[in-house]
């Protein structure tokens, strides 16, 4: 049973009232009973404005009255008066009368936005067993019980960094860490407005293994075709840049999996580092927001133009952007400009243009490398997980022998994780990436050039060169890796290759495949 502190919180439109009104949401009605005390009705009757008095009485009829024996109320009043400050503020005595009725009526929660009452919450709970909480706090507590699994933090990119929904009693730490150029109380109020709608708004925090807050992001799903991110904050840390890029990439995949064609990042207080990452996202600045259109489809160039014309655009600027993209796609198709079409594909990632004229390869990779470069499910099978400074990168590098020199850029990769008794899920096509650059050089030159990328240490690179520092190696820089929702097993892969390519393959080295093979494998992997 919960008691609302003030009937005006529900009845009127005023700052903060939305937080209290959220307690009347349909999904909560089976979880809580909102009651009024006699004290609320007394306050209504004392209102000198006849119209407001009658409106208050009519509104109060919507809620049951908490039964509270008068003798117990009086006893509680005497005990509660000891909690009053030496110089009581206006309204303090009314507050304790509310509390006295709630305690006598055996309420479990006393719900209020009054900061003075909330400061006394520990004393009241310890002495009387009544929990004084904000509306947002109560709603999060209930949602934690209803959807317990969603509040259990999960690994980020297979590392020991974890992400999960904002749990109860975390608000002050979050505000302290992530309030930026805005007023802290304004930020706190914005955050609460999202926390009270957990059925449609998902607020998540990212923590490192030592429980330090690294990031806060809010997904607003109240519009069917759009995923809006009204809050996107990343704390300053050595992982800040790579974590930002990773969270942006994952946001795009979430929207695509939910078949939401538009992402709108509308946080008015983004840091400069987040804005830089969005530009390479690629998001575009339209008005005061950052927008990205995306598709979870395989398209021919012709069907893509038709698809773009069907997009829902909410503003004139968005329509102009789509019109320009349609024009670029059409012109590139006529001119057979593969690189220009690839840029269109990147803008609509994870959409794939199946008739794009770039090479496609199946590339074998050992599980030990895959788990750090992209394969989070394998990393989760280990005690220490993937190295976050590698796994969070949007781009990485993969080394192999320089021969056979079949790989080129730009190109697509389907990653085949080779056989291993140590890891579950080996011998599957598990991910798809784009090759951005292929470089041939000596171990020392490549190590120096790509030092900031990849999991490979000098001993690993030298090992690939069979211990000879003059041997030529190939460094493959790749990006925009997308894990397949349903990895394609060896047996199914061989069946597709036999049907389309006319032969099977042991996949001991990079294998060039056709657009049709790619379309079948990818469609199977992402369940199109």
Predicted regions and their residues:
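A conserved beta-strand-loop-helix scaffold within acyl/acetyltransferase catalytic domains
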Residues: 182-227, 231-234
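A short, internal acetyl-CoA/4′-phosphopantetheine-binding micro-motif in the GNAT/acyltransferase core
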Residues: 230-243, 268-269
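Contiguous surface segments at macromolecular interaction interfaces
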Residues: 261, 276-389, 427, 438-528
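Conserved acetyl-CoA-binding loop-helix of GNAT-fold acetyltransferases
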Residues: 239-256
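Short, well-structured N-terminal submotif of metal-dependent ribonuclease cores
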Residues: 1-36, 46-54, 115
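Conserved GNAT acetyl-CoA-binding A-motif
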Residues: 255-269, 289
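Active-site neighborhoods of divalent-metal-dependent phosphate/nucleic-acid chemistry enzymes
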Residues: 66-111, 115
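Acidic, PIN/NYN-like endoribonuclease modules and their adjacent C-terminal/linker elements
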Residues: 11, 109, 115-188, 192-195, ...
């Amino acid at each position: 049973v919960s008691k609302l502190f003030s009937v005006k919180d529900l009845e009127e439109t005023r700052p903060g009232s939305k937080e209290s009104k959220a307690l009347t949401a349909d999904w909560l009605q089976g979880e809580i009973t909102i009651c009024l005390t006699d004290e609320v009705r007394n306050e209504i009757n004392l209102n000198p404005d006849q119209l407001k008095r009658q409106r208050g009485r009519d509104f109060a009829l919507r809620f049951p009255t908490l039964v509270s024996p008068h003798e117990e109320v009086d006893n509680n009043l005497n005990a509660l008066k000891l909690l009053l400050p030496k110089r009581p503020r206006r309204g303090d005595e009314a507050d304790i009368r509310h509390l006295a009725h709630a305690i006598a009526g055996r309420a479990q929660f006393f719900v209020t936005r009054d900061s003075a009452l909330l400061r006394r919450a520990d004393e009241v709970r310890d002495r009387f067993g009544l929990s004084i909480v904000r509306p947002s706090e109560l709603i999060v507590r209930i949602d934690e019980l209803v959807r317990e699994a969603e509040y259990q933090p999960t690994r980020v990119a297979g590392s020991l960094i974890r992400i999960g929904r904002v749990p109860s009693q975390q608000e002050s730490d979050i505000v302290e860490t992530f309030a930026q150029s805005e007023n802290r109380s304004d930020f706190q109020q914005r955050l609460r407005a999202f926390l009270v709608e957990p059925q449609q708004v998902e607020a998540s925090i990212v923590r490192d293994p030592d429980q330090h807050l690294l990031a806060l992001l809010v997904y607003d799903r109240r519009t069917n075709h759009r995923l809006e991110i009204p809050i996107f904050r990343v704390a300053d840390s050595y992982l800040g840049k790579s974590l930002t890029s990773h969270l942006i990439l994952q946001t795009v995949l979430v929207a695509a999996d939910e078949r939401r064609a538009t992402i709108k990042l509308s946080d008015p207080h983004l840091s400069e580092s987040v804005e830089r990452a969005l530009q390479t996202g690629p998001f575009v600045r339209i008005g005061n927001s950052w927008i990205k259109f995306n598709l979870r489809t395989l398209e021919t160039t012709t069907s893509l133009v038709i698809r773009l014309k069907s997009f829902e655009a909410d503003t004139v600027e968005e329509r102009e952007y789509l019109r320009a993209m349609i024009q670029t796609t059409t012109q590139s198709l006529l001119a057979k400009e593969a690189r220009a079409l690839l840029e269109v594909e990147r803008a609509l990632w994870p959409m794939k243009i199946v008739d794009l004229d770039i090479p496609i390869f199946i590339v074998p990779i050992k599980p030990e490398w895959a788990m750090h470069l992209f394969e989070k499910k394998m990393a989760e099978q280990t005690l220490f997980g993937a190295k976050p400074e590698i796994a969070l990168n949007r781009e990485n590098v993969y080394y192999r022998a320089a021969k056979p020199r079949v790989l080129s850029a730009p190109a697509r990769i389907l990653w085949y994780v080779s056989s291993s008794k140590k890891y579950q899920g080996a011998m599957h096509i598990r991910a798809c990436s784009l090759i951005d650059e292929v470089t041939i050089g000596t171990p020392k030159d490549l190590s120096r050039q790509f030092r900031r990328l990849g999991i490979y240490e000098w001993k690993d690179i030298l090992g690939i060169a069979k211990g000879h520092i003059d041997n030529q190696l190939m460094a493959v820089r790749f990006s925009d890796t997308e894990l397949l929702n349903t990895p394609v097993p060896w047996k199914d892969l061989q069946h597709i290759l036999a049907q389309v390519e006319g032969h099977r393959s042991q996949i001991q080295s990079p294998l060039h495949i056709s657009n049709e093979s790619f379309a079948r494998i990818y469609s199977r992997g992402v369940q199109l």
